[in-house]
Amino acid sequence: MSNQGKDSFKAYSYFCPCGQLFLTIHVSLTRLPQRQLDKRHVVDEKLNHIAHFSTGNKYYITRSDGGYEQRIQLLCRRCTLECAYALEAAPGYIYVDPTLVNEKPVTVSVSNLKE
């Protein structure tokens, strides 16, 4: 068992299939809610996190209920695979595809986190 002080804590890092680090958060994605539309895990950006992705293009998706939504691509920095997206109409949330990212428990220094 590791000795973690006040300046660090257990977290989970998520990696793109190409091996590039994509996102680090303090809870496992499996403990977060899933969006019913596409089963993506919903990450509230208010959670302590470290984003290792780049923002891509905006695009529109037509939903089965006849509506549409504007998404913003969240891309792997290495291979540019879209591992998650954000919604223009619901800022502050990241929708992560659990089939594309691999989880690894890590220890994170508090000084590296976004506030």
Swiss-Prot record:
Give the source's domain of life in one word: Eukaryota
A GO BP annotation: endoplasmic reticulum to Golgi vesicle-mediated transport
Q: Any coiled-coil ranges, and where?
A: none
- Cellular component terms per the entry's GO annotation: endoplasmic reticulum
Q: Which family does it belong to?
A: Belongs to the STEEP1 family.
Main function: May stimulate membrane curvature formation and subsequent endoplasmic reticulum exit site (ERES) establishment.
The protein here is known as ER exit protein
Gene name for this UniProt entry: new20
